[in-house]
Amino acid sequence: MCPCVERRAPPGVYYTPPPARTSDHVAAMPMTERRRPPYSCSSSSERRDPFHIVHKVPSGDSPYVRAKHAQLIDKDPNRAISLFWTAINAGDRVDSALKDMAVVMKQLGRSDEGIEAIKSFRYLCSFESQDSIDNLLLELYKKSGRIEEEAVLLEHKLQTLEQGMGFGGRVSRAKRVQGKHVIMTIEQEKARILGNLGWVHLQLHNYGIAEQHYRRALGLERDKNKLCNLAICLMRMSRIPEAKSLLDDVRDSPAESECGDEPFAKSYDRAVEMLAEIESKKPEADLSEKFYAGCSFVNRMKENIAPGTANKNYSDVSSSPASVRPNSAGLYTQPRRCRLFEEETRGAARKLLFGKPQPFGSEQMKILERGEEEPMKRKKLDQNMIQYLHEFVKDTADGPKSESKKSWADIAEEEEAEEEEEERLQGELKTAEM
């Protein structure tokens, strides 16, 4: 029998028609309207308390969780350090516990303790966390002023990158730099380490090594911060034109996102301030160079002449025969020259000159030609006086000259002849008296 016939209503009876079917589904209740299930005290993992999400602390009740709670919620860093030690000894998330403890020690000014803790317990950490531990160790070295150890660690990191073991064989890696997550390649990481090495050697006054590291870093990646630091390095080596050229390039470069970076602005201001300070001292240095240019002693000191070679030119000068004779009246010296415009002083000794004497009145001739004031009296000379002095100096300079220079033997013979003549005259006087 057909099933439709069985469902027919008897005569005089009518069935209520069924509701029309639609394809619409019932909307889900929003999460804010739902009731939370009751908490279960048996298992903490089943709790859905957002407290750890709001305060950015891990959930649970382990030594590391208690240490983070003391650090971030209770704001008790000393208690947090002791709890981090407990977590490290218990083996509870040793990587995070060691790094967080070192950060807290750095904030408390206990960087040396943080360095020793990392060196003692980093072997317990995984291989993947060693790079971040090295970065934290570099910050602690910088904070505590241990620049030499920082340079050694940076050299080790650079060598690791050059051997291809820095990123675990990968070409790029996501890193957190200055609070931002960035994708950094091996070349960018190498440039960053070279820049840090240049800055460390700049603090150690190794300016040549610092320049090499900065130029290598700029060859990998152009960075304005490194350009400013390289300019500072060149100024330390007295290469001012090159430093000014670099600063001009930085100033004239187009505005980029890097221009608003705080380290770049600080480096540029520091370099400009140092350049202004050097240029302010430059006129004084030029004046002192001009003042000491004619000083033979200063020139000799600049040439680094040894003490024994100062009088080497005079070592072959023979001594006067009269100096070895017992009855000699004194040494032979040149006659004292008259110096114009110079005050006479009593008891002035004659100076023995071996060099070529300057023309008489050369300095005074220069003064008169320039028409300058008289050095000692500070009076302006009139034109008649200047003409008179010109004639006087010229006549004196063209005075009688010796026909020829006499040797020491001729001088000795003349002295002996004079003594013999004196003895003969004294003998004649004695004979006449008798």
Swiss-Prot record:
Expressed at low levels mostly in floral organs during meiosis. Also barely detectable in leaves, stems and roots. Residues 411-423 have a biased composition (Acidic residues). A motif (Nuclear localization signal 2) lies at residues 377-380. Gene3D superfamilies: Tetratricopeptide repeat domain. Residues 393-408, 424-434 have a biased composition (Basic and acidic residues). Disruption phenotype: Sterile plants with abnormal formation of polyads during microsporogenesis, tetrads with more than four pools of chromosomes, after male meiosis, due to an unusual and abnormal cell division without further DNA or chromosome replication after meiosis I and II, and leading to collapsed pollen in flattened anthers. Chromatin recondensation and stretching after meiosis II characterized by a dense microtubule network connecting haploid nuclei in the tetrad stage rearranged into four bipolar spindles as chromatids recondense, as if haploid nuclei entered a third meiotic division. The keyword Chloroplast does not apply. GO terms for biological process: cell division; male meiotic nuclear division; meiotic cell cycle; microsporogenesis. Residues 13-47, 309-329, 393-434 are annotated as: Disordered. It is found in: Nucleus. Residues 310-326 have a biased composition (Polar residues). TPR repeats lie at residues 95-131, 133-164, 191-224, 241-274. A motif (Nuclear localization signal 1) lies at residues 34-37. Residues 142-166, 408-434 form a coiled coil. Signal peptide: none annotated. It comes from the Eukaryota. InterPro entries: MS5/SDI1, TPR-like_helical_dom_sf, TPR_rpt. Keywords: Cell cycle, Cell division, Coiled coil, Developmental protein, Meiosis, Nucleus, Repeat, TPR repeat. GO terms for cellular component: nucleus. Belongs to the MS5 protein family. Essential for male fertility, especially for microspore and pollen grain production. Involved in the regulation of cell division after male meiosis I and II to facilitate exit from meiosis and transition to G1. This is Protein POLLENLESS 3. It comes from Arabidopsis thaliana.
